[in-house]
């Protein structure tokens, strides 16, 4: 089965002889969705969305994820395999920020790091780093030094990265994605939508592939 769950500081870093402030985000909690929430009333989320794959792909997987969420980390290699097997012409992947800081204390600063990388055009590289190395940084008392290392490995402008992490622009994107998720009825992570349809927690990988194959056969319907 897909790994679903359903649930209701300051760091100064010396770079090149200077001190940069990696700001921590304010903690927020998800507002429970209204009973009549539905895709028909869904909010748009952050624009542009973090997306890869053809805009004309017959299958769109939209993930609402939390980088510190263990089931999200478990879903990550499954999604990478789907990407490899189907390719960008058939599968488009969209990631939406849905940090749950009340249970994952580093979730917001991880989302900030991803958004800061995105401002330099490298969101997906940071996404890969955060999920593939989740078991390491998520256990650290303060993981921001790990995020700086990831940014350096990716080749980001470090001064800009630390300035953007936790900035109002990054926080706005995170909040817009969370609001979209709430409007769709998302209450936990990962929540996965295929062509606008939320998958139930008991969905198996085979069922997901069957659904994707059917959508491809029917031209995305």
Where are these regions (language model features)?
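Ser/Thr/Pro/Gly-rich low-complexity linker/stalk segments immediately outside membranes or between
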Residues: 24-38
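C-terminal cap of thioredoxin/glutaredoxin-like
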Residues: 1-25, 64-66, 148-221
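Short clusters of hydrophobic/aromatic residues that line enzyme substrate/ligand-binding pockets
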Residues: 51-52, 137, 199
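Structural alpha/beta surface segment adjacent to cysteine/selenocysteine redox centers
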Residues: 57, 62-152, 184, 213-220
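Residue-level signal for pocket-adjacent positions within structured domains
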Residues: 38, 45-47, 132, 194
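A generic local structural motif
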Residues: 45-49, 79-80, 178-180
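A short beta-strand-turn-helix
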Residues: 42-59
């Amino acid at each position: 089965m897909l790994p679903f769950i359903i649930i209701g500081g300051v760091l100064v870093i010396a770079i090149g002889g200077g001190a940069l402030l990696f700001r921590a985000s304010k903690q927020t909690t998800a507002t429970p969705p209204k009973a009549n929430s539905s895709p028909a009333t869904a909010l748009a989320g952050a624009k542009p969305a973090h997306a890869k794959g053809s805009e004309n792909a017959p299958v769109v997987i939209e993930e609402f994820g939390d980088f510190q969420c263990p089931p999200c980390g478990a879903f990550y290699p499954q999604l990478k395999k789907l990407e490899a097997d189907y390719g960008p012409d058939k599968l488009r992947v969209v990631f939406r920020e849905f940090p749950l800081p009340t249970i994952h204390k580093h979730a917001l600063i991880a989302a900030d790091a991803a958004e800061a990388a995105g401002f330099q055009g490298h969101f997906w590289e940071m996404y890969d780093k955060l999920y593939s190395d989740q078991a390491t940084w998520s256990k650290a008392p303060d993981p921001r030094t790990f995020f700086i290392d990831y940014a350096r490995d990716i080749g980001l402008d470090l001064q800009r990265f630390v300035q953007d992490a936790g900035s109002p622009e990054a926080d706005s994107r995170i909040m817009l994605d969370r609001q979209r998720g709430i409007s769709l009825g998302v209450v936990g992570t990962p929540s996965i939508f295929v062509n606008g349809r939320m998958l139930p927690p008991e969905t198996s990988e085979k069922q997901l592939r069957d659904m994707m194959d059917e959508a491809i056969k029917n031209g995305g319907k």
